[in-house]
């Protein structure tokens, strides 16, 4: 997708050198937004291969409210291994905050709440889910990089709720390794929520705070920028699933994905 390559190019052209938590060093810009029209295909980067099983599986893991890598391992997904403790636990990360945000009266299921709000009060401006729980950050293996997202319902010409869009605010984006993953994950989430609320996916808006390229990814970025984006693939989800908790990997189908070869790079932990 050219819009993603434009972000990489902007970081190389305008970014500043900054030290970071991992000790690797980055080139970074602050404040960037990309808008993906989901009617034009699924926004999956084609200028390198993205392993979609990991993307789709991680999102379903979040939606399960899970914070242990056991389920991921059962599905041959190992993207969280570097942060898990000896028991496979990660602390109160995304799934916990999405499905079990602590409250004086118990816990709050933000995902169930937002799905119900979209169904019953589509014009609300409060269709928001947050993973940034300040009180629990110190207990998390990794504080949330993608921190808050909001849904927005658009009517058709007759005023009927028809289209669903999602905007993500991401405080920190590893633009070479992580951001393509995040784009695909939240585009998929938009498809899933649209499906169970009787809407159609319209747009995914990705707003980044610190968008950076690690210094040990620069060679891969230069190689990726030589590649011309190919057509977006098509995503379909099982329309028979009416509950956000009901989706399995087998309910998600991607067709027409024709990427360039992968560009391996080390992850900064």
Curated annotation (Swiss-Prot):
GO molecular-function terms, A-Z: thymidylate synthase activity
Supply the CDD domains for this chain.
TS_Pyrimidine_HMase
Write out the GO cellular component annotations.
Answer: cytosol
Entry EC number(s): 2.1.1.45
Q: Which PROSITE patterns match?
A: THYMIDYLATE_SYNTHASE (PS00091)
**Which positions bind (6R)-5,10-methylene-5,6,7,8-tetrahydrofolate?**
174, 268
Quaternary structure, per UniProt, is: Homodimer.
HAMAP family for this protein: Thymidy_synth_bact
Protein's name in the database: Thymidylate synthase
């Amino acid at each position: 997708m050219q819009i993603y390559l434009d972000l990489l190019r902007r970081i190389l052209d305008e970014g500043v050198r900054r030290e970071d938590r991992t000790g690797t060093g980055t080139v970074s810009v602050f404040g960037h937004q990309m808008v993906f029209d989901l009617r034009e295909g699924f926004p999956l980067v084609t200028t390198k291969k993205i392993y979609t099983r990991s993307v789709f599986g991680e999102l379903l893991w979040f939606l399960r409210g899970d914070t242990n890598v056991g389920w991921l391992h059962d599905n041959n997904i190992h993207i969280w291994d570097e942060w898990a403790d000896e028991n496979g636990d990660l602390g109160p990360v995304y799934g916990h905050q999405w499905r079990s945000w602590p409250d004086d009266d118990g816990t709050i299921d933000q995902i169930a709440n937002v799905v119900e709000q979209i169904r019953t009060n589509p014009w609300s401006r409060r269709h928001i889910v947050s993973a940034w729980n300040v009180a629990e950050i110190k207990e998390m293996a990794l504080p949330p990089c993608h921190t808050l997202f909001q849904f927005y319902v658009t009517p058709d010409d007759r005023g009927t709720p028809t289209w669903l869009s999602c905007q993500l605010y991401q405080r920190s984006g590893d633009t070479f390794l992580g951001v393509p993953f995040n784009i695909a994950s939240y585009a998929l989430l938009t498809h899933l929520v649209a499906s169970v609320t009787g809407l159609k996916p319209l747009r995914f808006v990705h707003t980044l705070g610190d968008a950076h390229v690690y210094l040990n990814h620069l060679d891969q970025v230069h190689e990726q920028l030589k590649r011309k984006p190919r057509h977006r693939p098509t995503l379909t989800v099982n329309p028979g699933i009416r509950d956000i908790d009901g989706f399995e990997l087998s309910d998600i189908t991607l067709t027409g994905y024709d990427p360039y070869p992968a560009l391996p790079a080390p992850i900064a932990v």
